């Protein structure tokens, strides 16, 4: 059986507890193949967020286009 494919669009959490990292773990638990497009990169841990750096819109668009031009995405999840 080929797993369904989901795309998450959101921020990257350096601590691994939120953002696309958490989304990809959830997709895996649901036996869904996860793809991602990163909107921002954070410097954070369990104590808080220290910094957020947004990616340029063109970079985000390129990530989304790359995934959608190749894979049959069945679901989309968005974050920050």
Predicted feature residues:
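Small-residue (G/A/S/T)-rich helix-start motifs and N-terminal tracts that mark the onset
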Residues: 1-75
């Amino acid at each position: 059986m080929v797993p369904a494919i989901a795309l998450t669009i959101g921020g990257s959490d350096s601590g691994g507890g939120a953002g696309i990292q958490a989304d990809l773990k959830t997709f895996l638990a649901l036996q869904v193949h996860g793809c991602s497009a990163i909107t921002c990169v954070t410097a954070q841990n369990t104590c808080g967020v220290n910094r957020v750096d947004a990616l340029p819109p063109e970079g985000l668009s390129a990530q989304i286009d790359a995934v959608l031009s190749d894979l049959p995405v069945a679901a989309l999840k968005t974050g920050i």
